[in-house]
UniProtKB/Swiss-Prot annotation:
Transmembrane segments: none annotated. The keyword Lyase does not apply. GO terms for biological process: fatty acid biosynthetic process. It catalyses: holo-[ACP] + malonyl-CoA = malonyl-[ACP] + CoA. GO terms for molecular function: [acyl-carrier-protein] S-malonyltransferase activity. The active site is at residues 93, 202. The keyword Membrane does not apply. Pfam families: Acyl_transf_1. Belongs to the FabD family. It comes from Buchnera aphidicola subsp. Baizongia pistaciae (strain Bp). Gene3D superfamilies: Malonyl-CoA ACP transacylase, ACP-binding (3.30.70.250), Malonyl-Coenzyme A Acyl Carrier Protein, domain 2 (3.40.366.10). Pathway: Lipid metabolism; fatty acid biosynthesis. This is Malonyl CoA-acyl carrier protein transacylase. Its EC number is 2.3.1.39.
Length: 311
């Protein structure tokens, strides 16, 4: 039996017509999770992904909840189809909430309320500011940190995510991010992509939001995860209720070190399964580790392929 880890994304490229393949959308377990989640959220999230005439899913307020619920629904179906347990679970950014739900550390209802509250606090932190997040392709972390220091942008612009050796996400005040983007381009960046994520996360602008969130987290019930969970920002195991609270609070202004965490665990883990409707983390992993197997459970073919390998 192979060791495997489950990966949970924090963001997905939401396309409402293709959020869930028929393999999932027609499944009773998946439908049940969406019904339960809709009760906690206060509106029909299943209907939203089927018909979104006002294009609400372009707003993080809605898309983050869809990402969470979709991943949990796919996980519940996965759990129903096999009897093995993951050796590890990891969430990228907001995906840590999903990882904690699936490892029975956090109730689904509490996760939904935390994500709604987290978004509210982050929006309040940006009340008089305009933010921006961009992905820099083709420059490494060291080069970008030198540019931030050279042009004195270290306080206005943060490294939000180190996804691979040569894919770095920047986050911060819009004009400052735009200026450092120009310097990155001159330094040899192959591509610079504006990310439609608002408010901007994993940057110093979110420190006030972090303090507010910590207060709420202190009044939220957590349990010790039944599967090992590693934080994608601190790279530490979440082995106590207090550690989880502190990690989730710090997360919104800290760097997601995806590149480091995957390199670290590849010594013991051969198979990486992304529990998602897309393949964002799977594609990142293929750039980080060449010899391990990465599969997204985003369609029937991949789901059945993964089941066959694991069983």
């Amino acid at each position: 039996m192979f060791k495997y880890t489950l990966l949970f994304p924090g963001q997905n490229d939401i396309n409402r017509k293709k959020i869930l393949s028929p393999f999932f959308s027609k499944n009773k377990i998946v439908q049940s999770i969406f019904r339960e989640s809709s009760e906690y959220i206060g509106y029909d999230i299943w209907k939203l992904i089927q018909d979104d005439p006002k294009k609400k899913l372009k707003n993080n307020k809605y898309s983050q909840l869809v990402t969470l619920v979709s991943s949990i629904a796919i996980y519940e179906l996965w759990k129903n189809k096999q009897c093995t347990h993951p050796n590890l679970v990891i969430g990228h950014s907001l995906g840590e909430y999903t990882a904690l739900v699936c490892s029975q550390s956090l109730k689904l209802s509490d996760a939904i309320q935390l994500i709604i509250t987290r978004y509210k606090f982050m929006m309040e932190a940006m009340s008089k500011k305009i933010g921006l997040m961009t992905a820099i392709i083709g420059l490494n972390e060291r080069t970008i940190r030198k540019l931030l220091k050279k042009y004195d942008y270290s306080h206005e612009v943060s490294i939000a995510c180190i996804n691979t050796d040569n894919q770095i996400v920047l986050s911060g005040e819009r004009n400052s991010v735009k200026h450092i983007n120009l310097h990155c381009k001159k330094a040899g960046a192959k591509n610079i992509i504006n990310l439609y994520i608002h408010p901007p996360s994993h940057c110093t602008l979110m420190k006030k939001a972090s303090k507010k969130l910590l207060y709420v987290l202190k009044h939220t019930t957590f349990k010790i995860p039944i599967y090992p969970v590693i934080s994608s920002t601190s790279l530490k195991f979440q082995n106590s209720e207090q550690a989880i609270r502190i990690s989730l609070a710090k997360q919104i202004y800290s760097t997601v070190r995806w590149n480091s965490i995957i390199k670290y665990i590849k010594k013991d883990i051969f198979i990486f399964l992304e529990v998602s409707t897309k393949s964002i983390l799977t594609n990142l992993n293929k750039n980080i580790i060449k010899k391990s197997l990465s599969i997204s459970l985003n369609c029937q073919a991949n789901f059945l392929k993964a089941l066959k390998i694991i069983l």
